[in-house]
Amino acid sequence: MAKTLKDLQGWEIITTDEQGNIIDGGQKRLRRRGAKTEHYLKRSSDGIKLGRGDSVVMHNEAAGTYSVYMIQELRLNTLNNVVELWALTYLRWFEVNPLAHYRQFNPDANILNRPLNYYNKLFSETANKNELYLTAELAELQLFNFIRVANVMDGSKWEVLKGNVDPERDFTVRYICEPTGEKFVDINIEDVKAYIKKVEPREAQEYLKDLTLPSKKKEIKRGPQKKDKATQTAQISDAETRATDITDNEDGNEDESSDYESPSDIDVSEDMDSGEISADELEEEEDEEEDEDEEEKEARHTNSPRKRGRKIKLGKDDIDASVQPPPKKRGRKPKDPSKPRQMLLISSCRANNTPVIRKFTKKNVARAKKKYTPFSKRFKSIAAIPDLTSLPEFYGNSSELMASRFENKLKTTQKHQIVETIFSKVKKQLNSSYVKEEILKSANFQDYLPARENEFASIYLSAYSAIESDSATTIYVAGTPGVGKTLTVREVVKELLSSSAQREIPDFLYVEINGLKMVKPTDCYETLWNKVSGERLTWAASMESLEFYFKRVPKNKKKTIVVLLDELDAMVTKSQDIMYNFFNWTTYENAKLIVIAVANTMDLPERQLGNKITSRIGFTRIMFTGYTHEELKNIIDLRLKGLNDSFFYVDTKTGNAILIDAAGNDTTVKQTLPEDVRKVRLRMSADAIEIASRKVASVSGDARRALKVCKRAAEIAEKHYMAKHGYGYDGKTVIEDENEEQIYDDEDKDLIESNKAKDDNDDDDDNDGVQTVHITHVMKALNETLNSHVITFMTRLSFTAKLFIYALLNLMKKNGSQEQELGDIVDEIKLLIEVNGSNKFVMEIAKTLFQQGSDNISEQLRIISWDFVLNQLLDAGILFKQTMKNDRICCVKLNISVEEAKRAMNEDETLRNL
């Protein structure tokens, strides 16, 4: 919300104690540990305070209107910000699902079974526009979007003040619902606000989520009866001995599920000796729904019908003091009977009076066992597996409430509930042979995904077919970097998520795994299982859990999962087991898994993966070719839309851009501008865009490189503009280096000379307030981008060093390996010389390199100055070399990109003709 204190300009952070007294920095250090404090923000201009439980009206740029939130927490000094403001989201009337509303509150009405548009229109006419619906969805607020403080009241107070309310400030809340606008539950908003202020933020959010969940019936089991005061022996019978929670007049609740075993359960089956309880005989049951940092539950032994209970007599000294009645005369004040008292575990002492078991040891054992227990070990049979779609911890239901930023990007716009999707446009033709053409006609791809319409349609059809039929499939997407592979897949998933949100297709879970972001390849198992179940297991336990989930869990008890494996090249291992597992899971009958693998290598399956993996990838392969110059031109025009003929204000002394309030008109702005500030119009010529797209398309077809060239060209044009008018940066006048060395091809030189006069005329035509990006600026940017310092260095190397690199590139092309032995490179150099024996220049070079035809010096087996050439390439960072005694079998590898090495070699005319 505020990364620095500068972002809090106009606001101050206030901290108060339990009595409401303001605490300064010195008092904070003197306060005792555990003392409760409250934080709130105060605006200096009007004294408005924002704290927990307050409702605020914020501007919503995506919806073009305002939204209302209830502040839940102020986080100070986080990892990225000085202060963060997190709030619960209210839904307004147009964000509610009208059909779900009428089904819940008017189930017998005659208005049911009507078209969806009918409910939208009816609800817009009858709904109270100032009624809000509270949700448990968290969102981070930005202070610059703050409008005003909202006055939220319950239904009874609203009825009293109904005729005298401010529609922009006063609101009423009667229900809490899910973020999708369904399942309404009656609440008292005043009680909710009081509860949020009283408890911790995490507990408050869990409380609100529990309100929207369906209530579960729990069996009530009576707790232990009170012992007689005179009794000094304890009898534990009809069960295995267990350590129990001892409370005053408290009834315990126990889940009677016998098919599901928690991963923290520890089975104990040894016999017990009279008067002594062994540490191995205690079992700790950890509630999965509680936080791991809570105090652990006291160990209990489960009832077993097979074993016969024993009576264990405890001496007077062995009985815990907590089970004895409190003293009558003196003693501490009794605790609230509604709150259970945590007691120490009943443990015996050995002869040396050392405790048998420690709490923290049992807690660590339970945590460790949980991380190593796979999902498959928790069920005794397949029939015992519950419906995973109804469990709140599965499929990221809890994490989505916390990750509101990601959720806001994927959910539909809040302006209207129904969004027209591709599915809704072509659903009638989905079974026809013209479905691909219909998809291409249904959306204007030029507005957000130019030149990738066919690839979009192919991926969309494959993914849609698998989701609709509850089947599994694999989609292999390949192409060079920067051709729109990941962007296209994300647009497909975004479109499918919109259709899923409107119940057009079944719901599914989307997981994105990037191979470059994994510390080790096996981390992908942990990431995927964490997204599916919300648990964090070891990679081995996660892999076993995923195997069981995709193979054994029935289809009707789980969702479809769409996994994007981006940067697949980085996940290839020597054993290839990771790739095999992911692609093999899609062959299971119950999988419901869609794997979209994105790689930068066209023939990765055939080159680096075995036959068993290649056969499981299938035939759905979509190849992304490089962009043509026309497509790159369209992309640049799309990205630069709104840039041409845009204005900015610049300080002529410092060169800094000045931000001007857009509310005022041009005349008012000119009157308020200082003398040193000028208004400048930015313009990029069509010829500059044309040459940028053509040059990049001829090299790689990388859209990112083309945009990078345009950005750099704009920076060069800015420097030219500042130098032309004598302006400066930070008080220093900009001077262009006219003697700066540039490397151009012959074709580039002719193009620059032919356009130089035209650019000079354009500069003369431009007035002082126009900054134009000409073709010369683009050529300089291309020279910097395409001809890097590495390429410049390599073009100036000796012919011997160039011949070495050229031979290395030839070997890499022949056998497809990145590492080559030095002996093979020497043989390749000799082969190149023999093959080009008709080339007089090559033959003369060979005589020089191997000292051939000399009377005084015998012919050399190695190239002359071999060690010098090799060390020169190693010191420059162009090569990696393996350290071995035998140089001939040492392996070398390029430390630069292959494209840069090829481009540098192509600069040499002799090597280009070999």
Curated annotation (Swiss-Prot):
PROSITE patterns: BAH
Annotated binding of ATP, by residue: 435, 479-487, 567, 600, 704, 726-733
PANTHER family assigned to the protein according to its UniProt record, in alphabetical order: CELL DIVISION CONTROL PROTEIN 6-RELATED, ORIGIN RECOGNITION COMPLEX SUBUNIT 1
Sites bearing Phosphoserine, chain numbering: S237
The organism's taxonomic lineage, starting at the top: Eukaryota, Fungi, Dikarya, Ascomycota, Saccharomycotina
Positions bound to Mg(2+): D566, E567
Record's protein name: Origin recognition complex subunit 1
GO cellular component: DNA replication preinitiation complex; nuclear origin of replication recognition complex; nuclear pre-replicative complex; nucleoplasm; nucleus
Compositionally biased residues, Acidic residues: 247-296
Spans annotated as Disordered: 218-343
TM ranges: none
Keyword DNA-binding: yes
Ranges of compositional bias, category Basic and acidic residues: 221-230
Assembly and binders: Component of the origin recognition complex (ORC) composed of at least ORC1, ORC2, ORC3, ORC4, ORC5 and ORC6. Interacts with MCM10 and TAH11.
Name of the coding gene: ORC1
Homology family: Belongs to the ORC1 family.
